[in-house]
């Protein structure tokens, strides 16, 4: 039986999800078909009896949005990554992949993703200094006293969007999404393969980290392989134009009924997406309004914790491998960063480093 606390927790995560969906739309992903991913996620939670929901993650959108040169490549990256992760989860290989890479290398990779997020935020601010700067100032002003990411994203997006409308006197003149059911056939090229592998590597780390955190909040066992299966299957909705959804740190984990609260959150977002309201709302929310939030989660919420996990009490080879993984990820992408870190972890002891 759902309680008021369950409903409030779900609503809080919904408020966090709406700006992320608008952010995804700025890269060409479509709102209505993204509802399919949320429904698949809810069905997966119900089928496996887990407490770990999925939603749009800023890091995922920033990675896919920047690695894909156009919407065809972005959708293809999400689809192929979804296939990879669904297979890995179904075979129960997620922990084996983590063990092979090494937890410090994976943590270094995730810290590198934090730097990528900060770089995307800075590029957004450069593209629109007025909106981006207001978003950044608001995000910092809210995050420092509260350390609450939901308040941070809502405040920074609302304030910077209001400033944009005050300055321009009218919403953006963009075409409102008119979705018709259609299949976007995935393409295959070097960029797509690299992007799919990069997203898969990022998903391995986030599923283990975020899945364990949310399950820990609920006092439940974290079935990461199950999470990997249904988050991977949810991303197959990108074949219809949907944005990819991934594991998140969800406040629903702290609700009295975390499973039901998580399912309610995803179904609510699916209904909002199908209603067609978000594409209309997106005319009033410039892409750069999310810049402050991206900077905060990159610099303050992602880099410090993962860098600490990567380097704290590390042996010399582990230290070098984590540093390589972090640096190369920040300069290229998570897949190349992970591979570079693994190579250093293997050869460093042989070379006596």
Q: For the regions a protein language model found, what residue spans apply to each?
A:
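Intrinsically disordered, low-complexity non-transmembrane regions of multi-pass membrane transporters
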Residues: 1-5, 163-192, 351-353
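N-terminal amphipathic alpha-helix initiation
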Residues: 2-15, 32
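Membrane-embedded helical hairpins/re-entrant loop segments and their flanking transmembrane helices
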Residues: 7, 19-44, 179-258
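Short, motif-level signal for alpha-helix interfacial/capping segments enriched in acidic residues
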Residues: 8-9, 219-220, 265, 310-313
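Helix-loop-helix junctions within the multi-pass membrane cores of secondary transporters/permeases
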Residues: 9-20, 41-98, 102, 223-304
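Alpha-helical transmembrane segments of multi-pass membrane transport proteins
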Residues: 12, 202-203, 317
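Residue-level signal for transmembrane alpha-helical positions in Major Facilitator Superfamily
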Residues: 15-16, 206, 320
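Membrane-embedded alpha-helical modules
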Residues: 68-174, 266-353
């Amino acid at each position: 039986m759902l309680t008021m606390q369950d409903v409030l927790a779900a609503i809080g995560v919904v408020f966090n999800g709406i700006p992320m969906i608008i952010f995804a739309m700025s890269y060409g992903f479509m709102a209505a078909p993204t509802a399919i991913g949320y429904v698949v996620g809810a069905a997966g939670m119900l089928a496996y009896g887990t407490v770990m929901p999925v939603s749009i993650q800023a890091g995922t959108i920033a990675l896919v949005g920047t690695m894909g040169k156009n919407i065809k490549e972005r959708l293809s990256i999400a689809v192929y990554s979804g296939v990879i992760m669904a297979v890995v989860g179904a075979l129960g290989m997620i922990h084996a992949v983590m063990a092979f890479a090494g937890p410090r290398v994976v943590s270094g990779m995730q810290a590198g993703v934090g730097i990528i997020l900060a770089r995307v935020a800075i590029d957004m601010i450069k593209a629109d200094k007025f909106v981006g700067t207001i978003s950044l100032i608001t995000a910092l002003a809210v995050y420092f006293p509260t350390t609450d990411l939901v308040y941070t994203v809502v405040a920074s997006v609302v304030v910077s969007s209001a400033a944009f409308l005050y300055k321009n006197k009218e919403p953006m003149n963009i075409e409102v999404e008119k979705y018709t059911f259609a299949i976007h056939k995935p393409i295959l090229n070097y960029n797509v393969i690299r992007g799919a592998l990069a997203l898969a590597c990022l998903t391995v780390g986030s599923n283990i980290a975020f899945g364990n955190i949310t399950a820990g909040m609920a006092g439940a066992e974290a079935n990461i392989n199950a999470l990997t299966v249904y988050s991977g299957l949810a991303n197959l909705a990108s074949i219809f134009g949907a944005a990819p959804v991934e594991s998140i740190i969800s406040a629903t984990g702290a609700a009295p009924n975390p499973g039901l609260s998580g399912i309610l959150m995803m179904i609510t977002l699916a209904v909002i997406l199908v209603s067609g309201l978000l594409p209309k709302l997106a005319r009033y929310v410039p892409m750069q309004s999310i810049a402050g939030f991206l900077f905060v989660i990159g610099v303050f919420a992602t880099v410090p914790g993962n860098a600490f996990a990567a380097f704290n009490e590390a042996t010399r080879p582990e230290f070098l491998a984590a540093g390589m993984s972090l640096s190369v990820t920040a300069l290229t992408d998570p897949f190349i960063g992970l591979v570079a870190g693994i190579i250093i972890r293997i050869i460093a002891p042989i070379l006596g480093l």
